[in-house]
């Protein structure tokens, strides 16, 4: 939301270019702090429980959703997973930057455009990523986090480009 004194407020429409830039930053953060993130998740049973519960809730929410609005609520669980992941960096500035990026802001634009299968693929990628973290397979974690963000980038930027053409 953009607020300008004496002019009002409006919702800033995210462009495919802006989303692409955000994914560049996400990839940078998620991979630069990867060793620390993996180590901290592996030694924190509370965080492990939170992540596993999040993944299970996410998959369940996708499976039982009967409307687009219920599918849209799954994005909150997606965002929560990534917040838990980046919080394991234990770097306050990185966590602040992640929140400021508002990288899940695109959700409002893509509701109804992404299929249940695409949404489920993302949740299942979270599970694979988490399994690799628990196994301490850092090269695999790097590959999976990169793949996950690139898949999301492709899906979201494709949808945003289509929406840009129709407006």
Put a short name on every predicted segment:
Residues 37, 89, 112-113, 160:
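Helix-loop junctions at the membrane-solvent interface of multi-pass transporters
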Residues 139-167:
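C-terminal effector-binding regulatory domain of bacterial HTH transcription factors
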Residues 12, 35, 95, 114, ...:
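Nucleotide phosphate-binding site architecture
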Residues 1-39, 43, 158-167:
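Short linear motifs at protein or domain termini
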Residues 119-120:
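Short helix-capping and inter-helix turn/linker motifs at the boundaries of alpha-helical repeat units
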Residues 17, 22, 26, 45-110, ...:
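Conserved amphipathic alpha-helical segments that form helical-bundle/coiled-coil interaction surfaces
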Residues 136:
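Residue-level signal for the nucleotide or nucleotide-sugar donor/cofactor binding architecture
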Residues 36, 84, 88, 155:
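Short alpha-helical functional segments enriched in proximate histidine and acidic residues
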